[in-house]
């Protein structure tokens, strides 16, 4: 798996987690669901989307899985 493919999969995972979080409001959920669909279905991807995913995940309660995901995204973004 290439670095880009790995980052893309982490972004999709981060967006999915952010959508399901209780702290994410309705408008954010709709936006994040749309972005996740675009990334996964149409292979639309950019570093800005990865940074946005990291931003939303950073706002969530820190569980072990969230901490690992944040670290992975930060490492892959450089």
Task: Show the residue positions of the predicted features.
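Short, intrinsically disordered, low-complexity terminal segments
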Residues: 11, 15-18, 33, 47-50
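Short, charged early-sequence alpha-helical segments and their helix-coil boundaries
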Residues: 41-72
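Amphipathic alpha-helical segments that form the core helices of the histone-fold
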Residues: 32-42
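Alpha-helix N-cap/helix-initiation sites
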Residues: 24-30, 43-47
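Short terminal alpha-helical segments
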Residues: 1-28, 70-73, 77
């Amino acid at each position: 798996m290439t670095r880009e493919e790995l980052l893309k999969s982490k972004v999709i995972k981060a967006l999915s987690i952010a959508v399901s979080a209780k702290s994410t409001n309705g408008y954010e959920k709709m936006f994040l669901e749309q972005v996740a669909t675009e990334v996964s279905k149409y292979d639309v991807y950019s570093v800005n989307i990865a940074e946005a995913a990291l931003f939303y995940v950073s706002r969530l309660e820190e569980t072990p899985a969230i901490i690992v995901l944040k670290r992975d995204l930060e490492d892959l973004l450089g």
